[in-house]
């Protein structure tokens, strides 16, 4: 944010001293040299010349502001804050770049109440400063003031609805205060304005799911999949919400479709195996675990062990042994598999 105001600062200082070149030529020269040092990254030397310029009658607002910027670049934030404060005082509180930058420094120092106060003063001077409202919202969130954060982000969104990131931020702010209806409304409005942003539909599904409205969540994911039918990540989200909605069989079909599109999606294979296991479709579970194992998943071994355990509960020792040896094929270094196999093969040892 400091960089955003650096150009404004330079034009302010240079314009001022051009106007008074004849009455304070030496101060103007010092400011020009200091600015050149600043642009060259020699911030300590720039500070020395800025102070000399001040002794020669340079404008104290410009000097304090430029010194503050130099301190900021060297990460001396307390010194930067003190000099921004001087620039504000010398300008009788009218130089908004100093206020915005001072607020930014307070944020870096984690002095959030001071940061919030500075942003409010700056935004009274520049009420259309979108980034200022966003940073104010972030500062409020750091203090736990969810309402303050929401109001600030609402201001930013009202000023610029073309930035899709504001839609997400405003929705999150509404969710934070429990206003899911408003969050959904903002997302729908954003999608209406930016129909190319399919991720809005996916995000809408996430919000509905957070609200435990699983049917609406699945509907939003499906709406996105109508446009991007091969989006395996959205398909995975759909399967997940279907399981939460106790629609495991539909979820298994979705997961199977994912694996047809992307056979090496091991998370989907494990998920399918687990859902099939929970619904007692053990053959389907075995197939899914083996697909995951073939593609290097370290988790599939636990699926095989669970299936073997179920087989032993049913007194099907041969089936348990087969499953454990199948697992050993993919995980030969797993000592627990070897131990379980020996236990079945040598029950009397």
Predicted segments — roles?
Residues 39-40, 73-74, 108-109, 142-143, ...:
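Register position in tetratricopeptide repeats
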Residues 52-53, 86-88, 121-122, 155-156, ...:
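Canonical positions in the second alpha-helix
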Residues 60, 94-95, 129, 163, ...:
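Residue-level recognition of tetratricopeptide repeat
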Residues 66, 73, 100-101, 135, ...:
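Canonical tetratricopeptide repeat
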């Amino acid at each position: 944010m400091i960089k955003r105001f650096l150009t404004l600062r330079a034009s302010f200082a240079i314009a001022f001293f051009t106007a008074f070149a004849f009455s304070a030529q030496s101060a103007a020269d010092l400011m020009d040299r200091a600015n050149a040092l600043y642009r060259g990254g020699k911030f300590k030397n720039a500070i020395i010349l800025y102070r000399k310029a001040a002794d020669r009658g340079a404008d104290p607002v410009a000097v304090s502001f430029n010194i503050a910027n130099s301190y900021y670049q060297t990460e001396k934030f307390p010194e930067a804050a003190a000099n921004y404060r001087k620039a504000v005082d010398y300008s009788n509180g009218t130089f908004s770049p100093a206020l915005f930058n001072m607020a930014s420094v307070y944020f870096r120092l984690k002095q959030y109440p001071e940061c919030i106060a500075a942003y409010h003063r700056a935004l009274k001077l520049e009420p259309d400063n979108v980034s200022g409202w966003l940073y104010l919202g972030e500062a409020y969130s750091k203090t736990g003031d969810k309402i303050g954060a929401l109001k600030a982000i609402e201001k930013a969104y009202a000023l610029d609805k073309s930035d899709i990131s504001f839609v997400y931020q405003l929705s999150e702010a509404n969710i934070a205060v429990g206003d899911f209806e408003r969050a959904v409304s903002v997302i729908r409005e954003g999608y209406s304005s930016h129909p190319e942003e399919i991720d809005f539909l996916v995000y809408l599904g996430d919000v509905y799911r957070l609200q435990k409205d699983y049917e609406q969540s699945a509907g939003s994911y499906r709406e996105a999949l109508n446009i991007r039918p091969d989006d395996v990540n959205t398909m995975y989200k759909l399967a997940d919400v279907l399981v939460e909605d106790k629609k495991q069989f539909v979820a298994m079909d979705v997961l199977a479709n994912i694996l047809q599109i992307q056979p090496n999606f091991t998370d989907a294979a494990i998920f399918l195996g687990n859902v099939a296991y929970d619904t007692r479709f053990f053959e389907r579970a075995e197939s899914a675990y083996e697909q995951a194992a073939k593609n290097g998943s370290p988790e599939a071994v636990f699926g095989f062990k669970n299936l073997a355990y179920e087989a032993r509960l049913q007194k099907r020792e041969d089936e348990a042994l087969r499953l454990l040896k199948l697992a050993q094929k993919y995980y030969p270094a797993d000592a627990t598999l070897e131990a379980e196999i020996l236990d079945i093969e040598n029950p009397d040892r």
